[in-house]
């Protein structure tokens, strides 16, 4: 049937994306420019190499699963920041206002960035094969990607497992 053909094509595309994502581990990160809450331009490379591991948390104010994960991510940050972890959140929100409201509400103690144009968002999501959010990119001190894909769930201990392995 036509529906099953569409499903098969979609499934094949998803599989290809998953394969490419798994191949991203070991690659050098790709730099992108974002904006801060105060509208300053900041590059991803400004954050890479400052700590043993940088978690880039990709989210948006309208994303339910993203918001549900934030309290767990805050706990992970508290537990690991002295062991070499830093976090930066990148929002793909269209609305500056909604983004800032969400940032105020969740009080994340790390830097908040946003893709400041549709082109930047598309380029960032394309370079990192972001098909949905929450998405996570984890970069080591040398700028090598150690993980890229669906957010490792702090709520389920997935993120902690990777951090325990990499921050020995």
Language-model region placement:
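A short beta-strand-turn-helix
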Residues: 33-54
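Conserved redox-active cysteine motifs that mediate thiol-disulfide chemistry
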Residues: 52, 58-75
